[in-house]
C-alpha cells in the first residue's frame, strides 16, 4: 500500500496500472482510506466533505450535491451540520469513505474499510465499494472478512511475516488449498495470529 501511495520505493518488481508503469504523479486519480482515520473534527460534516471535494477538483456546488446525496445514502443526512467530533467512530468512518470516493477516483486504496462495523453497516459500505468497482474503479483493500473477499475480489495475496503465503485469483487459491473456503485458508495460514490480507 505504501508503494502505491508513493511513500516507499519498491526494492524490486514493478507497479503497473492498466498495464502501464504506475506513478503517484502519473495522472491516475486516487482515493485512499487509511486504517487510522483522520479528518478535521472541529468542522461540520458538510464543510469537511465540500472542502475535500474541492481539493479533488469538484466545484463547490458539485461537492455539496455529492455530499448531501451520500449522507442520505448512509443515513447521516441529519448530521450534515454537526461537527465531526460529535459523531460516533462508525459515523466518522462513513464520512471518511464518502470523502475517499468523491470525484470517482480510478484507484481506490482501502485499509480495513469496514473495521468495527456491525453487519448492517458493513453490507451498506460494501455495496458502495462494489458500485465503484462496477463503475470501473480498481480497488485494493486490506480486510480480515473473508466474505468480503468472496464477494468483491478477483485476486488476493495473504501475507505472513512479510512473505506471500498465497497469491492469485480466488479460484486458484482455493484450488491450491484443495478447494477449501477462504475462511479455512485464512485460519490455516494464520492460525491464532492476526494476519494481513490484501485483495483486489
Short names for language-model regions:
Residues 108-112:
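Catalytic Walker B motif of ABC-type/P-loop ATPase nucleotide-binding domains
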Residues 167-168:
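ABC ATPase "signature
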Residues 149-151:
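A short, surface-exposed alpha-helical micro-motif characterized by mixed small hydrophobic
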Residues 5:
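Helix-to-loop junction immediately C-terminal to a conserved catalytic motif
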Residues 13-28:
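Conserved ABC transporter NBD signature motif
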Residues 50, 54, 61-79:
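Conserved ABC ATPase "signature" region
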Amino acid at each position: 500500500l505504501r508503494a502505491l501511495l508513493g511513500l516507499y520505493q519498491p526494492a524490486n518488481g514493478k507497479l503497473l496500472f492498466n498495464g502501464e508503469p504506475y506513478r503517484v504523479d502519473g495522472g491516475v486519480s486516487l482515493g485512499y482510506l487509511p486504517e487510522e482515520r483522520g479528518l478535521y473534527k472541529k468542522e461540520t460534516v458538510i464543510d469537511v466533505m465540500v472542502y475535500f471535494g474541492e481539493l479533488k477538483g469538484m466545484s463547490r456546488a458539485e461537492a455539496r450535491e455529492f455530499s448531501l446525496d451520500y449522507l442520505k445514502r448512509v443515513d447521516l443526512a441529519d448530521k450534515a451540520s454537526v461537527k465531526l467530533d460529535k459523531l460516533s467512530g462508525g459515523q466518522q468512518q462513513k464520512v471518511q469513505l464518502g470523502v475517499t470516493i468523491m470525484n470517482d477516483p480510478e484507484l481506490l486504496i482501502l485499509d480495513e474499510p469496514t473495521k468495527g462495523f456491525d453487519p448492517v453497516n458493513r453490507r451498506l459500505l460494501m455495496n458502495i465499494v462494489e458500485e465503484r468497482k462496477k463503475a470501473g474503479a480498481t480497488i485494493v483493500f486490506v480486510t480480515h472478512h473473508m466474505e468480503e473477499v468472496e464477494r468483491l475480489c478477483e485476486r488476493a495475496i495473504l501475507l505472513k511475516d512479510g512473505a506471500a503465503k498465497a497469491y492469485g485469483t480466488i479460484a486458484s487459491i482455493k484450488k491450491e488449498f484443495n478447494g477449501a473456503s477462504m475462511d479455512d485458508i485464512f485460519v490455516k495460514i494464520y492460525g491464532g495470529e492476526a494476519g494481513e490480507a490484501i485483495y483486489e
